[in-house]
């Protein structure tokens, strides 16, 4: 199973590009899947998922009550902002301004591996998120 593990710091350059950490790039390349980004529903961050996870998510939406407003809101919240990312030869992709505003990222960022996906957060928010998460298990 391919997984996104560990945490890495990075920056957004003047052209709004971020370089994906090499181990994450390797996971994406080895998966041979498309890669998608969207606004997290849990935190002020961006989530990056492979197409297999997105397909699984869409399938789960389709298996739920079609007329459920809750299901419809969930689909809208995720799928209306979902975007495929294009990774260049240097392993970078562009983070659109609307995603930067939502996640409060500007220059320094952190990539946090979550197994089947990874999150991109503003560095200080990400460091704090990791600290809070660890404290929950003491």
Predicted regions and their residues:
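Flexible "stalk/tail and boundary" regions
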Residues: 1-10, 14-17, 23-85, 89-90, ...
């Amino acid at each position: 199973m391919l997984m996104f593990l560990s945490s890495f710091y990075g920056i957004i350059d003047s052209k709004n590009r971020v370089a994906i950490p090499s181990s994450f790039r390797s996971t994406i390349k080895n998966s041979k899947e498309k890669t998608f980004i969207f606004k997290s529903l849990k935190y002020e961050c961006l989530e990056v998922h492979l197409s297999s996870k997105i397909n699984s998510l869409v399938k789960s939406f389709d298996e739920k009550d079609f007329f459920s407003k809750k299901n419809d809101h969930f689909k809208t919240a995720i799928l209306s902002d979902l975007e495929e990312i294009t990774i260049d030869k240097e392993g970078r992709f562009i983070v659109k301004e609307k995603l930067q505003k939502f996640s409060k990222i500007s220059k320094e960022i952190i990539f946090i591996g979550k197994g089947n996906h990874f999150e991109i957060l503003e560095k200080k928010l990400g460091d704090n998120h990791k600290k809070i998460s660890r404290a929950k298990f003491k």
